[in-house]
């Protein structure tokens, strides 16, 4: 018998944070925002997608998925029985018809990828989504080492347009999906 596990956060002491705690924090943040909200996250983080949908519903907003992998993961999650009870997403082409205080865009590009949806939105080359002064972009992810330069450049370009940027550095909007050291110790104890 062999056990193989993820050790990405083995050097992070204590236990990993809870998605439920992030959900509460993000709901609190979003409840106070008056214009468009753009959330950039890893599409593969289905729990974070569920958090975004939960916050959209609780704040009376529609949600629109932007980016191919966001659509692909959403569809796969539904096929596997996840995200069954969330509100139906709005097509990005129709989202511009919704009042600015009633829409959340959940998009790819949280690492500043040149072809990611957020980069295309920020550079005003996305065919369906635009942002403007007073909107808020939430980076609901951690910076992967090596992506700092392009991600800070993206964030700076957004801020220069008078758009608020919220990151894990200035608000509680992300917990890792990887187990911390104490979580790993617990797991090894359970399987002994």
Model-predicted regions and their roles:
Residues 1-192:
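Acidic/His-rich, metal-assisted hydrolase cores and their charged scaffolds
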